[in-house]
């Protein structure tokens, strides 16, 4: 049953459907929001709100990295520099926000020393399934291309 849910998530092509699928209680959802996001896209705001970042959206558009589950924030870097390790055997995760070589802030979602990033400008999402103990999906929302979903 869980494998069917994972496959349905991977085949979802719009933010509304993906938002619904991410409510699976067996999912940890890692969300990286780059500084390039300005919050003008209403669909993106709804997506992030459903993912658990609604309170953060009230204080202007957030930048940082979050770990959420069922629309609740479990951990977050905040907008400043941070590095947080999260262990869920057999995996080890790191969410971090740091200054890059060009002085701009960069976000990273790392699992077992592999960095996951689909788009350079926008939102990156990594979905970990607690039952299968695998990364089940990863995608980006490219704000430089009309919030197109990139898998």
What are these regions (language model features)?
Residues 1-151:
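Short acidic-hydrophobic catalytic motif
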